[in-house]
């Protein structure tokens, strides 16, 4: 049995300015996205697209800026609407109190979809072409976010067997019984494993929309599995059919992603072969 080390959430204190580990993980997520996206510029079909203009670093900068806005706004609104709609409808000004915590991946994803739709429209590019470009660069950012959750000692797992070698006591949970370190599970599943699978998948010739569909299915399945080990939100608990809110939100992702992949697979033309 392990004990969570209760790491100081403040990584660096500069006078009145406190730099939190969680903020650094967001910074790492955006930095990793930029690095991987510049690599994607070398892959087909993006390396050979000329109309309405060649893909460039400026495109990546704009995608990242709009994506950050989508993550923050969508993540916050998603949390308020998916998890505590009654409370925030009664206290709408507290939606702006982001420093109190409360972000939703599913809301952030919707925010990113909307922001990239705007980017695609303004650059006259197919939306799915943009999303296929973005999708393989996302999982490393998710991994960074889960490490932030672990450092903060939040979003811990359900109780585990006392014999589980990596069972961990999270003192912030108010219990000294071992739990699953579900943040680590999500780091490995939604972060590292999804990244490896999707990056390799995206480097081969794919029809437009298949990479996006694969991301939706992959994330949805891995998150659905991880939720069995994650402690449900205490104000929601377990919902219908014994599933958590996170699992229910994954269902349309999996179904929609599978439908998108199938629809894309019916298209006649595939992208040219990718290169390293």
UniProtKB/Swiss-Prot annotation:
It is found in: Cell inner membrane. One of its GO terms (biological process) is lipoprotein biosynthetic process. InterPro entries: Lgt. It is a multi-pass membrane protein. Keywords: Cell inner membrane, Cell membrane, Membrane, Transferase, Transmembrane, Transmembrane helix. A 1,2-diacyl-sn-glycero-3-phospho-(1'-sn-glycerol) binds at residue 146. Its EC number is 2.5.1.145. PROSITE patterns: LGT. Its main location: membrane. GO terms for molecular function: phosphatidylglycerol-prolipoprotein diacylglyceryl transferase activity. One of its GO terms (cellular component) is plasma membrane. The chain crosses the membrane at residues 17-37, 63-83, 95-115, 182-202, 209-229, 235-255. It comes from the Bacteria. Pathway: Protein modification; lipoprotein biosynthesis (diacylglyceryl transfer). Catalyzes the transfer of the diacylglyceryl group from phosphatidylglycerol to the sulfhydryl group of the N-terminal cysteine of a prolipoprotein, the first step in the formation of mature lipoproteins. Belongs to the Lgt family. This is Phosphatidylglycerol--prolipoprotein diacylglyceryl transferase. It comes from Polaromonas sp. (strain JS666 / ATCC BAA-500). The gene is lgt.
């Amino acid at each position: 049995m392990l004990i969570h080390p209760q790491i100081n959430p403040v990584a660096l204190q500069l006078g009145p300015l406190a730099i939190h580990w969680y903020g650094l993980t967001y910074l790492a997520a955006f930095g990793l996205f930029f690095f991987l996206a510049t690599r994607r510029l070398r892959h087909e079909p993006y390396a050979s697209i000329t109309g309405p203009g060649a893909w460039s670093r400026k495109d990546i900068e704009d995608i990242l800026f709009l994506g950050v806005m989508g993550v923050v706004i969508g993540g916050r609104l998603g949390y308020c609407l998916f998890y505590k709609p009654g409370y925030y409808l009664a206290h709408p000004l507290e939606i702006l109190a982001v420093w109190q915590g409360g972000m939703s991946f599913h809301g952030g994803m919707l925010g990113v979809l909307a922001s990239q739709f705007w980017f695609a429209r303004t650059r006259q590019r197919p939306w799915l072409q943009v999303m296929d470009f973005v999708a393989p660069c996302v999982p490393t950012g998710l991994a960074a976010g889960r490490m932030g959750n672990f450092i903060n000692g939040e979003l811990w797992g359900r109780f585990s067997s006392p014999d589980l070698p990596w069972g961990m006591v999270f003192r912030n949970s108010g219990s000294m019984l071992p739990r699953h370190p579900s943040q680590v599970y999500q780091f490995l599943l939604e972060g590292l494993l999804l990244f490896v699978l999707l990056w390799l998948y995206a480097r081969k010739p794919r029809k437009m929309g298949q990479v996006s569909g694969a991301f939706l299915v992959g994330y949805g399945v891995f998150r659905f599995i991880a939720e069995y080990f994650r402690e449900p939100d205490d104000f929601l608990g377990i919902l219908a059919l014994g599933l958590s809110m996170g699992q229910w939100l994954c269902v349309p992702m999996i179904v929609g992603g599978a439908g998108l992949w199938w629809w894309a697979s019916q298209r006649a033309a595939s992208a040219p072969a990718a290169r390293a």
